[in-house]
């Protein structure tokens, strides 16, 4: 198998994994993310080894497909990253709200603070 065909196969696998819906279960989702990360590493290794220049029409078509799918993969990974950041922020807010309920008088006090009424 040529490196171009190998890259095409890895790109197709990655495209399928990225566009599969993420599982709501945290452990299964983490496993999916690990699989995606592994495919990205394998794909990067194939790209680092070097690719031959496409000479015939079939090779050029494969390269076009790889480029189109790579763009779609990048967009989907950015979307997934945004979702993960949003979930992290929601978790932090939930944690902060729970802390306020657990320790309602833990915040800063206004005792001993000088308020300057002049402006």
Curated annotation (Swiss-Prot):
It is found in: Cytoplasm, Cytosol. One of its GO terms (cellular component) is cytosol. Signal peptide: none annotated. Transmembrane segments: none annotated. It comes from the Bacteria. Keywords: Bacterial flagellum biogenesis, Chaperone, Cytoplasm. GO terms for biological process: bacterial-type flagellum organization. Homodimer. Belongs to the bacillales FliT family. May act as an export chaperone for the filament capping protein FliD. This is Flagellar protein FliT. The gene is fliT.
């Amino acid at each position: 198998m040529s490196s171009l065909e190998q890259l095409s196969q890895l790109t197709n696998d990655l495209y399928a994994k990225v566009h599969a819906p993420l599982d709501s279960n945290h452990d299964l989702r983490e496993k999916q993310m690990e699989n995606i990360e592994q495919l990205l590493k394998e794909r990067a290794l194939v790209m680092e080894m070097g690719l031959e220049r496409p000479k015939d029409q079939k090779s050029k078509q494969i390269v076009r497909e790889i480029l189109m799918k790579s763009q779609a993969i990048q967009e989907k990974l950015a979307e997934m990253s945004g979702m993960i950041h949003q979930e992290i922020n929601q978790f932090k807010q939930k944690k902060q709200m729970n802390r306020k309920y657990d320790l309602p008088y833990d915040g800063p006090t206004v005792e001993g603070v000088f308020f300057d009424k002049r402006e």
